[in-house]
Amino acid sequence: SVIEKKLDGDLSKFYYLGPMWRYERPQKGRFRQFFQAGVEVLGYPEGLAELELVSMICNLNKEFKINNPVLKINHLGNPETKEKFSRSLLDYLNPMKSDLNEKDLSRLKNNPLRVLDSKDPKTQEILKDAPSISDYLPKSSLELLLKIKKIFSEECNIKIDHNLVRGLDYYSGFVFESISSDLGAQDAYLGGGRYDNLCSQLGGKDMPAIGMAIGCLLYTSD
């Protein structure tokens, strides 16, 4: 919509709200039909936009009295960082391919970083000794994570999780998700990240962007 309306290239902030449906079988804490809200911040370079979104998340959790919220944050670096780390992770996991399930094998083939998102206990055990993206991140990326954690230390329970990659391949830079232990197998009710390269990949202008999606019913359910 941003590209169609020729809004790419401008400093813009958008929000949306509406019903959506899941194709896959919903797990505990999820519904077939659900309402989702989203926030997109376009044209703002890394730094201030991240602080604004984290502040919004802290306020939402407080306003809706979310039980035991934890905001997990990570940084995926730049394309070169992701490529180097991806190769290192692939080298580590290849000798243990026979221990991975079918879904994680597909992830390993198409995007090794997505294996970090696996919920399989066996895969998680294998990943305990895997390389960490923190070893490949530039100093500025690590400093941003520490800065966010420090600024909001009294408002949010923030955890730096270097295995957090999110489920969409277009994310670059800062990524995050907020979880609650009360929501079953799928405990993330909010998540997002920076996607600076997506607009140009879809035929629009090259511009920085960051956003998040919020599962609205999870904020209002008992």
Give residue ranges: language-model regions.
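TRNA-recognition modules of translation machinery and tRNA-sensing kinases, especially anticodon-binding
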Residues: 1-221
